[in-house]
């Protein structure tokens, strides 16, 4: 597809006036060759393995950004799941040592975030998984760049309720800034460029570049220019805008890959918001005709938007990766955060919207004194949606000490202001104490 002069002008307007940017360039590196039996040896091997890549990463990204005239917001690193690296070591103290090392190494080379401090526990917990869980809260509370997740459910194996409950305990022991870097997930793909879900998957090459795009302001402007359009016309206009946004991600990915000399992996099609004015997914939904995001019609509007983004983005890239849909992180979207604080958006509304988007319950403030039963039940609800709808979803909750519904907690930067939401009138949910594994659903049988 070629751009005519009018379309070129539109892209320039997107870059200059509509906050179009690349959210993240994520370098994903296989760190399993650095596994050793002592944590000190593992750290030495990791340093030797990662430094040649990291020395070139930020200079390469800045060179491409300058040459193309595109703003690239963050530079990120994803490593192999750290729980695997902990298998021969198996203690929480080593978990924390690895965390501090990775955090310091990232700072040394100008890397904004490191993903992969993670474990896959959807069918059970291994020695390395246990070591990671035991040290995870201290690791995240004591670092600023580290991000991680626990994958506790999958369509193929069901939901590990023991891991769900342990995840709830971890969330409640995290400081707000640390909680913003931790998620509980299901069905997580191997090539996610967004944090905290990024990690180097077992099926990937030794190193690969994955790209995360942004651009809600672009789509909002398109929608506002069509106040009388029918649903089909609106869908087509969003689809065309998504093509242009994602095509930029493809170009940046190819150029950075060439500069670094590593393969280009995929572009995550997801349109990600930020706390800036004019960079909101919720504002798009309201421009489509909702009186307020969270009102009746919100799930339909989001479904229409996500479908258009997927179809437009898929045509623009050589390889689709990550979560590829739309993100509705409450605190990272100024309009969504305000609606949550007002009570227009509730936890149940967000659960319903999770059925048609890709993030689940994301960046939601909860009272710091919330019970572990309630937090575990919230996680279990989203894991059920992921397993029985056969899709990736996650939960990222931010406990706010002393916070009450309607309060804000300012995390700053891309995380924005967390709105504390009403989560439950109940404090005890005995179902969450049953433990065990909920078996996979019928979708598992369809896969053979």
From Swiss-Prot:
Source organism superkingdom: Archaea
Family that this chain belongs to: Belongs to the UPF0210 family.
Name of the protein: UPF0210 protein PAE3581
